[in-house]
Amino acid sequence: MDHYLEIRVLPDPEFSSEMLMAALFAKLHRVLGARGQGDIGVSFPDVNVMPGARLRLHGSAQALQALEASTWRKGLTDYCQCSPVTPVPEIKGWRVVSRVQVKSNPQRLLRRSVKKGWLTEEQAIERLATQAEQRTDLPFLNMKSLSSQQLFKLFIRHGDLLKEPVKGEFSSYGLSATATIPWF
């Protein structure tokens, strides 16, 4: 995690920055999944209500250069500006950037559990009475599942600043429940 590169989504009259960031992130997800290394993490330096127009990729110089050699942004190069792979500047701290899955529709989840054979209909009805819908105000990207083609919101949490880094692997989204990225 000693290098990074930054991609900025450029303003466009036809496409919102959220739409372009989601398209960029979907391409990143595909290439990170194909690499299967778990050595590149992401952060959104402008995160607020939405992730913002900047995406940072964190990793070793070798990992980031290998990623860039794959020309994974093909088709989006006119819509974004990318920095070269650069050493990390002075670090303010370390941060976990993770995915949060919100169970927003208990009825749908219980129907799925019955269909899969995990619960009987009676058990599902009992549980439905006790389960409440979950909501979150975390920033998100609108994504499309590659396997089912269903649309979903990928909620992203930037954890508190930590004093020490935590090693670990990153998912094909560049997110981790435990591993940290440098925050600067």
Swiss-Prot record:
Keywords: Antiviral defense, Endonuclease, Hydrolase, Nuclease, RNA-binding. It comes from the Bacteria. GO terms for molecular function: endonuclease activity; RNA binding. The keyword Hydrolase applies. GO terms for biological process: defense response to virus; maintenance of CRISPR repeat elements. It holds the Pfam family Cas_Csy4. Its EC number is 3.1.-.-. Belongs to the CRISPR-associated endoribonuclease Cas6 family. Cas6f/Csy4, subtype I-F/Ypest subfamily. CRISPR (clustered regularly interspaced short palindromic repeat) is an adaptive immune system that provides protection against mobile genetic elements (viruses, transposable elements and conjugative plasmids). CRISPR clusters contain sequences complementary to antecedent mobile elements and target invading nucleic acids. CRISPR clusters are transcribed and processed into CRISPR RNA (crRNA). Processes pre-crRNA into individual crRNA units. Complements a csy4 disruption in Pseudomonas aeruginosa PA14, restoring inhibition of biofilm formation and generation of crRNA. This is CRISPR-associated endonuclease Cas6/Csy4. It comes from Escherichia coli (strain UTI89 / UPEC).
